[in-house]
Amino acid sequence: MIGTRALSSVTVEQKEDGNGVNVTTQNISYCTSGMYRNALITAGIKNADVKVAGPFKISGTAALVGVMKAYEEMTGKKIPEKSKDAATDELITTGEVAENIGSDDAEKLIADVKQKVAEDNLSSPSEIKQAIEESAKDLNINLSDTDREKIQSLMDKISGLDLNVSQLTSQAKDLYDKLGGSQGIFDKIAAFFQSIFSWLSNLFS
């Protein structure tokens, strides 16, 4: 859950187009830089360098609210409440899923499913469920039923935000470049045998 006491300090610096969202942390024990970044992009934040620091080791969950408020004050633009709500839910869900599959895999999985939902305008429970299964398979991640339900609930919210896919991927370019280049192991095997089959077909044709 999001902390009720904000012990962290946050700074947000507006950067030029193409910079993306970059987050650095200090004395934050629960939320990773990637978790913050993914959630902030969902909120609509773009081209900003963000620093989150604690006076000692703290979870850092309450800092997300502070970053969004600082961004609003810096740009003079109000972030819609439903975007804030989805971003907060994303941070919580990613953290909870990370407890079972690790932070790196949780960040990649949530980002990949989010891209599918936004890119294909997925909204029905069955479509979102299929997207979750496909992403988990591609990334070779085993999910518990509980984590599937949490991600499903999050994506239900995200599907109503009308996210801009190009903005989504450009603000975390390094992450989405990795995801774009990652195929599931079975896909790689299938592609390998397909290439062998094509070579043999050409050889004997």
PLM regions: where:
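Signal peptide-directed extracytoplasmic domains
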Residues: 1-47
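Short, Lys/Arg-enriched charge-dense amphipathic segments
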Residues: 8-14, 70-82, 99-112, 146-154, ...
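N-terminal secretory signal sequences
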Residues: 8-10, 33-42, 81, 122-127, ...
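Detector for Asparagine
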Residues: 19-22, 27, 38, 47, ...
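Residues that form generic nucleotide/phosphate-binding pockets
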Residues: 39, 116, 154-157
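Soluble oligomerization/assembly scaffold segments of membrane-associated complexes
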Residues: 41-141
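Extracytoplasmic/luminal low-complexity segments enriched in Pro/Gly and acidic/polar residues
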Residues: 125, 129, 138-205
